[in-house]
Swiss-Prot record:
Effect of loss of the gene: RNAi-mediated knockdown results in embryonic lethality in 10% of animals. Surviving animals have a reduced brood size and abnormal diakinetic oocyte morphology.
Manganese is among the record's keywords: no
Gene Ontology BP annotations: DNA replication; meiotic cell cycle; oocyte morphogenesis; positive regulation of brood size; positive regulation of chromosome organization; positive regulation of DNA replication; positive regulation of meiotic nuclear division
Function comment: Plays a role in meiosis, germline development and oocyte morphogenesis. May play a role in DNA replication. In the germline, involved in the maintenance of transition zone nuclei and in chromosome structure and organization, but not required for mitotic proliferation.
Official protein name in the record: Protein atz-1
Length: 268
C-alpha cells in the first residue's frame, strides 16, 4: 500500500516537471519572438500581445515554480512518510516471514515429538534451525510446507487418538472383566466364609460328639467292668454248683455200680 502511494506521488511530480519544462520552452520561444519583434519595430499590436503573453507566461512560470517548490517539499515530506511506512511494512513483512518460518519449524518439532511433553529447548532449536530454513526454503514455500506439516500433525494426532481410543476400550473391557471377577471373588469369599463357618460348626459338633463318645465309652467300660465282675461271680457260683453236682453224680454212679454188683451176686 505504501509503495503504491509513493509511485503515485512520483508520477504526479514527474507530470508537473514535464508541464514546467513545456511552459519554459514555450516561454523561451515567445521571448525570442518578442525580442525579434522589438528589433524590427514592426507590428506593435503583435508585440503588445506577445508582451502580455510573456507576462502571463512569466506569472504562470512563477506560479509553477512556487507550486513545484511547494510540491517538491510536500512530495519530499510525503516521500519521507511513505518511505517510513514502507520500512515499517517491510519490517512487518520480515517479521511475518520469520514468524512463518518459526511456525513451520515449531510444527515440525511438534510432529517429531507428538504426544510428548513440551521441550523447553525447542526455542533454542528453532533459532539454530532458522538460518538453514531461510536458506533452503523460499518465503512463498513456507505456507505450503506449513500446511503439509499440519496435515502430517493431524494424521499423527488421529493415529494417536485411535490408539488412545483402542487403549481406552481395552481398559474399559478390563475394568468390566475385573468387576465380573470381583463379583465372583466376593461370591467365592461369601461361599468360603459360609463353608468356613460350617466347618467350624461341624468341628464343634465333632468335638462335642467326641466328648459324648468318650463319655459313652467310659460308661460302657464301667458297665463292661461291672458285667465282667458279675460274670466272674456267676462263673464262681456255677463252678461250685458243678462241683456239687459232680459229687452227687459220683455218689449216684457208685450206688448204681453197687446195686449192679449185688444183683449179679444174687443171680449167681
Amino acid at each position: 500500500m505504501a509503495s503504491i502511494e509513493l509511485r503515485n506521488v512520483q508520477t504526479e511530480l514527474a507530470a508537473k516537471n514535464l508541464q514546467f519544462k513545456v511552459l519554459t520552452e514555450k516561454f523561451l520561444e515567445q521571448r525570442k519572438e518578442l525580442f525579434d519583434a522589438k528589433k524590427t519595430d514592426s507590428n506593435v499590436e503583435y508585440v503588445e500581445c506577445l508582451s502580455e503573453k510573456l507576462r502571463v507566461a512569466t506569472e504562470r512560470i512563477s506560479d509553477l515554480e512556487k507550486e513545484t517548490k511547494e510540491g517538491k517539499q510536500v512530495a519530499n515530506e510525503e516521500i519521507g512518510r511513505l518511505e517510513k511506512l514502507l520500512r515499517e511494512a517491510q519490517q512487518k513483512r520480515d517479521a511475518k516471514i520469520d514468524e512463518s518460518y518459526q511456525t513451520f519449524l515449531r510444527i515440525e518439532l511438534l510432529v517429531a515429538n507428538l504426544g510428548e511433553s513440551t521441550d523447553p529447548e525447542n526455542e533454542k532449536r528453532i533459532k539454530n534451525l532458522m538460518p538453514a530454513a531461510k536458506t533452503g526454503i523460499p518465503p512463498e514455500g513456507v505456507l505450503r510446507l506449513t500446511i503439509n506439516a499440519l496435515d502430517s500433525a493431524a494424521r499423527e494426532s488421529k493415529k494417536k487418538t485411535m490408539a488412545i481410543e483402542s487403549l481406552t476400550k481395552q481398559v474399559d473391557d478390563a475394568n468390566k472383566l475385573t468387576e465380573v471377577y470381583m463379583k465372583r471373588l466376593e461370591e467365592l469369599e461369601d461361599k468360603h466364609r459360609f463353608e468356613e463357618a460350617l466347618t467350624l460348626k461341624i468341628q464343634a459338633m465333632m468335638i462335642e460328639t467326641t466328648g459324648q463318645l468318650e463319655a459313652q465309652k467310659k460308661i460302657i467300660a464301667d458297665l463292661q467292668k461291672k458285667n465282667d465282675d458279675l460274670m466272674k461271680e456267676e462263673e464262681g457260683e456255677e463252678d461250685y454248683e458243678e462241683e456239687e453236682n459232680y459229687e452227687v453224680e459220683e455218689d449216684f454212679e457208685d450206688e448204681e455200680e453197687y446195686d449192679e454188683e449185688g444183683e449179679e451176686e444174687d443171680y449167681e
